[in-house]
Amino acid sequence: MTVRLAEPSVPSRRFHGTPTLFDLSLSENPFPPLPSVVAAVRDTLAAANRYPEFLPERLPRLIAERLGVLPDEVVVGAGATGVAMQILRALGGGEIVSSTPTFDGYPIMAEMAGMPLVSVPLDAAGQQDLAALRRAVHRRTALVVLCRPHNPTGTVLDAAAVRGFLAAIPRRVPVLLDEAYAEFLDPADRLDVDGLLRRHANLLVLRTFSKAYGLAGLRIGYCVGRGELIARVRGQQLPFGTPAAAAAAVRACYAADDELRARVGHIRREREALRMSLRACGIDAPVSQANFLYLPGPGVATALRRAGIKAKPYPDGSARITVGDPTAGLAVHTALAGLRG
């Protein structure tokens, strides 16, 4: 499978007026928030006339207790993208080295921060090319970005390869490990984040409550790091920028582990069932450990749009689709069943 450079997509006039039956473009969780989470958020609204904390303390403390790190090693913000933007501003210039295609927020944020983006193509298997990324690092490099699982392919770098890569990067160069979809990983593929942070003071780990926890609309993200680097990121936090609802929602999510694990398990099963059904139709989707599938082109994005399915399209006709809704999965299968003859 070859994955090519992603460009900003422009809606085709051919599909003007085609109704969108399923929006599978943003890797959203198909489940609404749990009732206990909704209730916890609703309870905070009675005090909506009051300002939240000047700088967040309750939310970082909750997350730190969960991860087994110190509260001052956690920085929170408006989703993973909000925290990533804080990181770029904290670095104050230089180049960003990242794979391509990747989460399309990184090119946008790099431009906003005035930081040139050095893009390294994925290898033929849809994996991030660690050797090529290492070669791209030089004296002007301010940040290296890894995604695990990768967006848009869902592929996962081997843990030993990640450890070797971190050891090979100069200590002066921060590495951002984007784990937005970490909760969907097989247990055996999960990293020892605390151990990595102890060994690598230049590491930042980025996560979100938008995906597995289904709180995309509340914009709750965080990163974990050590020492002077995480302190610089914390210095970019917006005063009064974290509403009380965020800590209430996270506390309720953590209290509902079993229910949330069941939802993640459902999404994982639906993902694999859809992947196998599409493979039987000639669509060679790579094994994914996220809540989406990458469907190689040509013609996939067009066939989906024609069927009223909004996906994340790529220039070669490939597409990324959210998984988890069985009805949407059936619509995807129907739209693509005859594409490969």
Give short role names for the model-derived ranges.
Residues 267-268, 272-307, 323-325:
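Conserved PLP-binding catalytic core of the aspartate aminotransferase-like
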Residues 114, 118-121, 143-150, 175-179, ...:
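Short beta-strands and strand-loop turn motifs
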Residues 56-95, 113:
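Phosphate-binding glycine-rich loop
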Residues 1-50, 65:
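N-terminal "arm"/small-domain region of PLP-dependent enzymes with the aminotransferase-like
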Residues 89-146:
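PLP-dependent aminotransferase-like
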Residues 111, 128-139, 152-175, 179-215:
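Active-site pre-lysine segment of PLP-dependent enzymes
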Residues 160, 307, 312, 316-341:
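PLP-dependent enzyme catalytic core of the Aspartate aminotransferase-like
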